[in-house]
Amino acid sequence: MTVSHPAHRVAMLCVHTSPLAQPGTGDAGGMNVYVVELARAMAAQGTEVEIFTRRTTANQPDVVEVDDGVLVRHVTAGPYEGLDKNDLPGQLCYFTQGVLRTEAARQPGWYDIVHSHYWLSGQAGWLAADRWNVPLVHTMHTMARVKNAQLAPGDAPEPRARIIGEEQVVEQSAALVANTDKEAHELHTLYAADPEKVHVVAPGVDLAAFTPPIDDHQRQAERVALGLAPEGDVIVFAGRIQPLKGPDVLVDALALLRSQQPDRPMPTLVIIGGPSGRPAALGELRARVFQRGVAQHVRFVPPADRPTLAQWMRVADYVAMPSRNESFGLVAIEAQACGTPVIAADVGGLTTAVAHKKSGLLVPDHRPQTWAGVLQVALGDTQLRESLRAGARRHAQQFTWDHTATDMLAVYERTRVAASVNTG
């Protein structure tokens, strides 16, 4: 392989969830946003991106043009619907076959890089990269060993097959991309990744889509438009309804606040999202709300599109993220871009996404008592709230997709040069 030009065409693989899917339900989340926004930003810098994902409905077109230079290709691999993520490894041969068939219709050397997202995609990615004689760049997004070390009560551990699959992808990848220094350290210590091939590239945020309110009048007007009272404290949770994201912690903390301060006005907790993995998860969370006696203070909202999500974030006093783990936590950066501070668990990438006591607060554990105490301080200290609100937008402005794309393209280039040297 000889390198005479920057990577101008990238094959991105995203097997288990489409970048076009609505975040906040099923398996769709921050990774979906990451893939499509990174692709758009790289295309704006002159690199074409084709994203391969598994077809999940019969009426999905073969190809969708997302933006200039960005295509999503739907690959048939197994049943369209009703296939659990845990069953997807059995469909990887069909998915890989579909990816290779697309490239076979092109002139040789069509793609310069394969970039896979999540371990399932890495399994298909290393075969495609080997066939096309191009480097494989891989982003884990989440890792089984990390998740298993921080399981929520009653949550099932990730299977041994996934751990083995991740080890294989780490070994086969020419470059590994981590969201944070902490994730890079986990790749090295938990998966024996060569530090020389691990690169840290921070995700971004669309600062034009996620903006602060112009003034208090706009904030109050948006609250009314969303069915809220113009005054009063509002806490927003936005994410999939699953133990990993910890919405149960917020419900229990709210119940403690109510019992400890029965005469104080209660905040409204808005839970935005749908179930993931277990369809019963949403019903169980609703039942928990009633059992804890806080139903009148909790509002459930379906997964929201980007403009509506930005509205919810603008009207909130705080966005809360009691996740058991996050490789980064895009919701945190989106909220802060709206000028809303974040109260987050002190885990994973959230320690980078949130600047403690500057743009938000990091909570040391997942005990409802601890969260109730932090919420009590955060809601009761007006000076702290205003200070964090001022710092939130400043912190978010450090993260842009344009910067992410620039750094990622640099990783591609270094990886291609190294591969060229190694193969002579």
UniProtKB/Swiss-Prot annotation:
UniProt binding sites for Mg(2+): M313, R314, A316, T340
Matches recorded under SUPFAM superfamilies: UDP-Glycosyltransferase/glycogen phosphorylase
Record's subunit section: Homodimer.
InterPro entries to which the protein is assigned, alphabetical: Glyco_trans_1, Glyco_trans_4-like_N, Glycosyltransferase_grp1, Mycothiol_biosynthesis_MshA
Keywords: Glycosyltransferase, Magnesium, Metal-binding, Transferase
General function of this protein: Catalyzes the transfer of a N-acetyl-glucosamine moiety to 1D-myo-inositol 3-phosphate to produce 1D-myo-inositol 2-acetamido-2-deoxy-glucopyranoside 3-phosphate in the mycothiol biosynthesis pathway.
GO molecular function per UniProt: acetylglucosaminyltransferase activity; D-inositol-3-phosphate glycosyltransferase activity; magnesium ion binding
Family that this chain belongs to: Belongs to the glycosyltransferase group 1 family. MshA subfamily.
Record Pfam families: Glyco_trans_4_4, Glycos_transf_1
EC numbers for this chain: 2.4.1.250
PANTHER family, per database record: SULFOQUINOVOSYL TRANSFERASE SQD2
Name used for this protein in its record: D-inositol 3-phosphate glycosyltransferase
Any single biological process term in GO: mycothiol biosynthetic process
Domain of life: Bacteria
Binding site for UDP-N-acetyl-alpha-D-glucosamine: Q22, P23, G30, R240, K245, E326, E334
Catalytic activity: 1D-myo-inositol 3-phosphate + UDP-N-acetyl-alpha-D-glucosamine = 1D-myo-inositol 2-acetamido-2-deoxy-alpha-D-glucopyranoside 3-phosphate + UDP + H(+)
Binding site for 1D-myo-inositol 3-phosphate: H16, D27, A28, G29, G30, M31, N32, K85, Y118, T142, R162
Keyword Acetylation: no
